[in-house]
Amino acid sequence: MKRTYQPNRRKRSKVHGFRARMSTKNGRKVLARRRRKGRKVLSA
């Protein structure tokens, strides 16, 4: 059986990257929440 996590750098950044987050309203909300919480890393 194929495992669910098949690492791929391009997909990772396209889906969870900073620019992907900034491109939508809700993505910006995610970043704002993570900043408020004090996360060292905001996005993949």
UniProtKB/Swiss-Prot annotation:
It comes from the Bacteria. The keyword Ribosomal protein applies. InterPro entries: Ribosomal_bL34 (IPR000271), Ribosomal_bL34_CS (IPR020939). Residues 1-19, 26-44 have a biased composition (Basic residues). Residues 1-44 are annotated as: Disordered. The lineage of its organism: Bacteria, Bacillati, Bacillota, Bacilli, Bacillales. Gene3D superfamilies: 1.10.287.3980. This is Large ribosomal subunit protein bL34. Belongs to the bacterial ribosomal protein bL34 family. GO terms for biological process: translation. GO terms for molecular function: structural constituent of ribosome. GO terms for cellular component: ribonucleoprotein complex; ribosome. Keywords: Ribonucleoprotein, Ribosomal protein.
